[in-house]
């Protein structure tokens, strides 16, 4: 990495800071000495201009629409490989050889079963519990069921925990779905692929044979690959921050799942489907398009544009292709929401307003439609996102633990509250709050 210097003057004191340049993307100013030298912090709400770590895993260029896993473009990985190949890549930094792929796949498939006591653990939840609430609990509980792999200082235990998370999260996700609809849990099968196994555990029933549709299985696999990692987003940063305290890996991933549950992060595809429900019919699309263009109208089209990608989301093109393959394979012709989605897509792609502002349908738009076509209810969408992102969280956590520069996260603040004041006895206080109790 090349290095030069930045100079900053604070309170008439000029200091010199190192500037580091990565392989790709913007450089960073190292500010660790800023507080010591100037008694001043930097202020960056949301950390949108702050690099919290050094990483070799995922790179994003939002202006150019680039997403790389360990240097490999996402479209190549999704089209030419499969999800477990991307898992290996994110975990080890290189694509596997043929034999390494065979061994890794076998290892994952042989660890997909979960402890049998998990079946009783599920019965502690209401049937109408949100699946994400169940997943947060299950991921945290894994440290109780698999406490032989929670020593983060042991490299072998770290890798065992990583393998267990990649292999068992789809089983737990399928169990959460089955429990919510009152059906029997389905055990994984070692002869099926990762994605096919997940579909089998979700949709097969004991009374009849479930046949794997290769088109649908491939679509599920692509969805997993496209969502495997996305640099230092909110949930990944949460995993790293929790992990910096020395928490066990299962607790860290549970924290990531909890963060992903937030509608501003992982709930975008679910929000997109709810928007389609709000539109209601193809005939009302022009009305909502007009509302989306009106700056004074609070309505926003979900699933269009992206906070990071100022150009086209590189995952969207593959997801669009996959979406249409699924719709064609299933020959869905009488689903009102899918009709609205397809019509809305065509309208937006040909509307000058959306073209000029580069508000293209993003990966959430197409993945939401695809998941609905596959038969998943909207409340499962974020669970599937968490399933796919588990490998990214695991890889980022592992990288952080193995970083010699790693230390516990401790963000600072700009304090704007009261200065020191004297305690007032309760009989002399005057209420300044408008609190109501019931």
From Swiss-Prot:
Pfam families, alphabetized: Citrate_synt
SUPFAM superfamilies (UniProt xref): Citrate synthase
Gene3D superfamilies: 2.20.28.60, Citrate Synthase, domain 1, Cytochrome P450-Terp, domain 2
Name under which the protein is recorded: Citrate synthase
Keywords attached to this entry: Transferase, Tricarboxylic acid cycle
EC number: 2.3.3.16
Enzyme superclass (EC): transferase
Active-site residues annotated for this sequence: 306, 364
Family: Belongs to the citrate synthase family.
Presence of keyword Lipid biosynthesis: no
Gene Ontology BP annotations: tricarboxylic acid cycle
Transmembrane helix in keyword set: no
GO function terms (MF aspect): citrate (Si)-synthase activity
Reactions it catalyzes: oxaloacetate + acetyl-CoA + H2O = citrate + CoA + H(+)
Organism, as annotated: Bartonella quintana (strain Toulouse)
Miscellaneous comment: Citrate synthase is found in nearly all cells capable of oxidative metabolism.
Cellular component annotations (GO), alphabetically ordered: cytoplasm
Top-level taxon of origin: Bacteria
Pathway info: Carbohydrate metabolism; tricarboxylic acid cycle; isocitrate from oxaloacetate: step 1/2
